[in-house]
């Protein structure tokens, strides 16, 4: 099941990036027929919203859950995943839900229309729209079941001596992230259910009106909630970098606390602008948007402190994990900038005139593609992190190592694509390009339309590079694993790993371990004797 999630998740990411490229090309021509003529704002919005739902629900979450489904039982010394039949059912429900949702969107359904002249004046089909709502709910419910299976494994199947403080950082990050998902996604499903119930009425009054459906759902892609889907990036890097350095992770508890703090700062179910229009000015929202940068910096500092005390060996997974961390750091910095207007407004009480221009400019950033830039950096960082995990754990998952040179090339390609695609959105956000746009009236506040058009072309080129980066990974998996051209020597532990998954065969036998492991520290293969789990 884990392998299937990974396989289809990569293709889901390619679908999302293709749709994003189409949107960026459309935005490259403001106020006239674009390079790609969508024909109506409804068709544009269908493509725009599907690019977001597919990147999160068809790519990032299944990749993370797939990696965890396979690895978490091995990392915690469990004989199998908890509720394996439920996990299998969840995967097939997820896949069927995706197929239904994509078909309904292309059949003039989708998750609403922001500016309709009437309920279905732009050609939306009510039955297809209803099925779009139900199918995406089915997808998210399936992902929740998969998450529950992973968390149940961590909680109930740890071996003797392994407390939560001895969990490998990837398993710990999945426990933290999964807990946030379980708290937040049911609220999102409730928003979806309210929209669906009202939509079924003869005359949708508010929640089911097509112009309001997306507004009730969009908080999942916004700060702070979006960071909950990148928490495992920290865990993956935390497992890879100490092994690549050949030393144990220093200040292990602080690393765990940093991951936990990021989880606490990424719970965003309260930040729903549809129900709370003033949320962007509230102290909690602003504080979370700024403070999320702190645990990321602390975690990266811990990894840097560990790596300089060892001897880093070059590998594709090392490069990819560093790129993923840097992308997440940029996302957190952009988020802090995005929400800083109200924070500076509080300082204005000291002097009520000299900060006026700055505050007005920072407030203007709200509602622009700056929010899209944050989302894109976070989700692509998650994709890069999972790819790093694939190159690190591929001997354990598939029995073959992936090609190191192809992995390094994919890291460079993904980094270049993110710089062009995400960076152009940051610049266009500063230039006041609005989000969720189609017609020229939405660009009335843009400083320089020619510059916005130019950077949208740059963003489309970046999208092509991102697509090529994922394509390289798929190609490497095909050649190394499916065609069995990869190196299978020393597949049990080619890197000198520190955690339990490297103590069994690759791929693991039925039951995972020949005997139940006994653990007394967080690095059981590095310190197999009872030497304590204290920080060094």
Q: What does each of the following model-derived ranges do?
A:
Residues 1-536:
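Membrane-embedded and interfacial regions of multi-pass energy-transducing membrane proteins
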């Amino acid at each position: 099941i884990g392998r299937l999630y990974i396989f289809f998740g990569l293709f889901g990411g390619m679908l999302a990036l293709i749709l994003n490229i189409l949107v960026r090309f459309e935005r490259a021509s403001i106020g006239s027929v674009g390079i790609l003529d969508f024909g109506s704002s409804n068709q544009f919005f269908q493509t725009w919203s599907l690019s977001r739902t597919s990147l999160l629900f068809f790519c990032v979450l299944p990749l993370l859950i797939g990696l965890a489904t396979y690895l978490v039982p091995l990392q915690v010394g469990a004989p199998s995943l908890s509720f394996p039949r439920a996990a299998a059912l969840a995967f097939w429900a997820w896949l069927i839900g995706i197929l239904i949702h994509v078909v309904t969107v292309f059949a003039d359904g989708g998750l609403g229309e922001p500016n309709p002249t009437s309920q279905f004046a732009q050609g939306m089909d009510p039955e297809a729209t209803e099925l779009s709502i139900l199918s995406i709910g089915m997808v998210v419910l399936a992902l929740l079941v998969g998450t529950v299976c992973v968390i149940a494994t961590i909680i109930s199947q740890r071996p003797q001596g392994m407390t939560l403080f001895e969990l490998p950082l990837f398993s710990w990050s999945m426990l933290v992230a999964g807990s946030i998902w379980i708290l937040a996604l049911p609220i999102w499903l409730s928003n979806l259910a309210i929209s669906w119930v009202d939509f079924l009425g003869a005359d949708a009054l508010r929640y089911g009106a097509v112009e309001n459906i997306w507004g009730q759902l969009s908080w999942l892609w916004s700060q702070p909630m979006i960071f909950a889907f990148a928490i495992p990036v920290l865990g993956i890097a935390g497992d890879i970098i100490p092994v690549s350095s050949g030393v144990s992770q220093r200040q292990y508890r602080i690393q765990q606390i940093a991951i936990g703090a990021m989880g606490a700062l990424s719970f965003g179910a309260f930040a729903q602008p549809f129900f709370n229009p003033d949320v962007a000015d509230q102290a909690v929202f602003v504080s979370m948007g700024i403070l999320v940068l702190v645990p990321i910096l602390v975690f990266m500092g811990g990894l840097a402190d560990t790596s300089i005390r060892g001897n880093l060996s070059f590998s594709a997974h090392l490069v990819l994990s560093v790129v993923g961390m840097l992308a997440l750091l940029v996302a957190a910095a952009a988020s802090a900038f995005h929400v800083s207007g109200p924070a500076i407004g509080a300082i204005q009480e000291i002097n009520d005139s000299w900060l006026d221009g700055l505050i007005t400019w920072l407030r203007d950033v709200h509602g622009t593609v700056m929010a899209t830039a944050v989302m894109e950096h976070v989700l692509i960082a998650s994709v890069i992190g999972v790819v790093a995990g694939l190159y690190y754990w591929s001997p354990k998952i598939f029995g073959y190592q992936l090609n190191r040179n192809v992995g390094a090339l994919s890291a460079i390609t993904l980094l270049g694509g993110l710089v062009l695609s995400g960076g152009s959105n940051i610049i266009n956000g500063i230039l006041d390009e609005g989000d969720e746009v189609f017609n020229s009236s939405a660009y009335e506040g843009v400083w320089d339309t020619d510059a916005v058009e130019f950077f949208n072309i740059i963003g489309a080129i970046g999208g092509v590079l991102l697509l090529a980066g994922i394509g390289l990974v798929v190609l490497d998996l095909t050649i190394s694993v499916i065609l069995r051209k990869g190196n299978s020597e020393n597949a049990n532990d080619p890197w000198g790993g520190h955690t339990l998954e490297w103590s069994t065969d690759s791929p693991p036998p039925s039951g995972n371990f020949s005997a139940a492991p006994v653990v007394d520290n967080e690095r059981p293969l590095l310190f197999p004797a009872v030497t304590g789990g204290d920080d060094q």
